[in-house]
Swiss-Prot record:
InterPro entries: Transgly_assoc (IPR007341). One of its GO terms (cellular component) is plasma membrane. Belongs to the UPF0410 family. Disulfide bonds: none annotated. It is a multi-pass membrane protein. Keywords: Cell membrane, Membrane, Transmembrane, Transmembrane helix. It comes from the Bacteria. The chain crosses the membrane at residues 2-22, 28-48, 58-78. It holds the Pfam family Transgly_assoc. It comes from Bacillus subtilis (strain 168). This is UPF0410 protein YdaS. It is found in: Cell membrane.
Length: 85
């Protein structure tokens, strides 16, 4: 249970760092950052592998890069939806 909570906290931090790199604000606050961190870790692992330091099952650098990619794509989608409305 404790490792799951640590993983969620790491996912939140990764999501916040990814959104800070891209400069987009995530919808959903902390929950949005957690989702971005988890999906970013998945994207980063798929694209870049597991190089670099690891914390709570997350390869830090690929996860941050993946979160930045995810937040950037999410920002493009939301911008497109706002323009259509």
């Amino acid at each position: 249970m404790l490792s799951f909570l640590v993983s969620l906290v790491v996912a939140i931090v990764i999501g916040l760092i990814g959104s800070a790199i891209v400069g987009n604000r995530l919808p959903g606050g902390i929950f949005g950052s957690m989702i971005a961190g988890l999906i970013g870790a998945w994207i980063g692992h798929g694209l870049l592998g597991t190089w670099g330091p690891s914390l709570a099952g997350f390869a830090i650098f690929p996860a941050i890069i993946g979160a930045a990619i995810f937040v950037f794509l999410l920002g493009l989608i939301f911008r497109g939806l706002r323009k259509e409305a």
